[in-house]
């Protein structure tokens, strides 16, 4: 996969930064108002009844704060949170160890829950629904079934691909939260908050410009802010203003619509080689030398959301906005 500054997946050096910036309470969490408003009600109701919060599924593109939201939920509930991810839970014993370590009301957070092996997932069904698990101990004739009661707990699952969840697993989540790309005003506030925490000087206009080019994604906004700060220190006096922001992002190949060279390559390939489409996903992937899943999951969502690309039954189509943005003449088909 191409190493892009606009990659929505977490890079190796970003875990510490994201932990440092992580809000503790819902009223500190910027954006995602619809999800927050629902969670406030569900959390307060669970606390009033002295019950564990219903199992919660958070889904949406990478970098939008699903992990942060899980930790905020645990803080609001006043309980411990145990964190793991689907690929890490390789066998039933791994999951049993996690479940057996939970206290009443605790949160078990499983990131990338769609990547859990099916054999492990099936153990979760009774754990989520009735708070018990039955496991086999031993092998052959010496094997026996052991019934293990669990304390009431809350499972929070996070996924970028909700469609890959099995129906039985999805049905056991009482609460679902769709994390959406951030509005410009919210992302601007996030940029200014990050700058304040790390003692960076930034003008409001620069924060707006940086947010506008961050693809509606806080992770990208914070990453770009770090890079623009470097430019401000070397090419200026340390102040991040709109001029240095524009120069820095232009040098980083991030245009005014938040598109980088890969996004532009996708659109130019469609326009120059296929007359704007329709183009099949496999054909497009081969032409830009990327995996099909990478194009579908990482590049297309933002291009579609911003109106540069359409998915049709016959393939991908570049829109009039894509032609205009890249300077190509557009003829209505």
UniProtKB/Swiss-Prot annotation:
GO terms for biological process: DNA recombination; DNA repair. It is an enzyme of class 3 (hydrolase). Residues 1-182 are annotated as: Large ATPase domain (RuvB-L). Mg(2+) binds at residue 67. It is found in: Cytoplasm. ATP binds at residues 21-22, 63, 66-68, 129-131, 172, 182, 219. Has 3 domains, the large (RuvB-L) and small ATPase (RuvB-S) domains and the C-terminal head (RuvB-H) domain. The head domain binds DNA, while the ATPase domains jointly bind ATP, ADP or are empty depending on the state of the subunit in the translocation cycle. During a single DNA translocation step the structure of each domain remains the same, but their relative positions change. InterPro entries: AAA+_ATPase, AAA_lid_4, DNA_helicase_Holl-junc_RuvB, P-loop_NTPase, RuvB-like_N, RuvB_C, WH-like_DNA-bd_sf, WH_DNA-bd_sf. DNA binds at residues 292, 311, 313, 316. It catalyses: ATP + H2O = ADP + phosphate + H(+). SUPFAM superfamilies: P-loop containing nucleoside triphosphate hydrolases (SSF52540), Winged helix' DNA-binding domain (SSF46785). Residues 183-253 are annotated as: Small ATPAse domain (RuvB-S). This is Holliday junction branch migration complex subunit RuvB. Belongs to the RuvB family. One of its GO terms (cellular component) is Holliday junction resolvase complex. Keywords: ATP-binding, Cytoplasm, DNA damage, DNA recombination, DNA repair, DNA-binding, Hydrolase, Nucleotide-binding. The keyword Nucleotide-binding applies. Homohexamer. Forms an RuvA(8)-RuvB(12)-Holliday junction (HJ) complex. HJ DNA is sandwiched between 2 RuvA tetramers; dsDNA enters through RuvA and exits via RuvB. An RuvB hexamer assembles on each DNA strand where it exits the tetramer. Each RuvB hexamer is contacted by two RuvA subunits (via domain III) on 2 adjacent RuvB subunits; this complex drives branch migration. In the full resolvosome a probable DNA-RuvA(4)-RuvB(12)-RuvC(2) complex forms which resolves the HJ. The lineage of its organism: Bacteria, Bacillati, Bacillota, Bacilli, Lactobacillales. Residues 256-333 are annotated as: Head domain (RuvB-H). Its EC number is 3.6.4.-. SMART domains: AAA. GO terms for molecular function: ATP binding; ATP hydrolysis activity; four-way junction DNA binding; four-way junction helicase activity. The RuvA-RuvB-RuvC complex processes Holliday junction (HJ) DNA during genetic recombination and DNA repair, while the RuvA-RuvB complex plays an important role in the rescue of blocked DNA replication forks via replication fork reversal (RFR). RuvA specifically binds to HJ cruciform DNA, conferring on it an open structure. The RuvB hexamer acts as an ATP-dependent pump, pulling dsDNA into and through the RuvAB complex. RuvB forms 2 homohexamers on either side of HJ DNA bound by 1 or 2 RuvA tetramers; 4 subunits per hexamer contact DNA at a time.
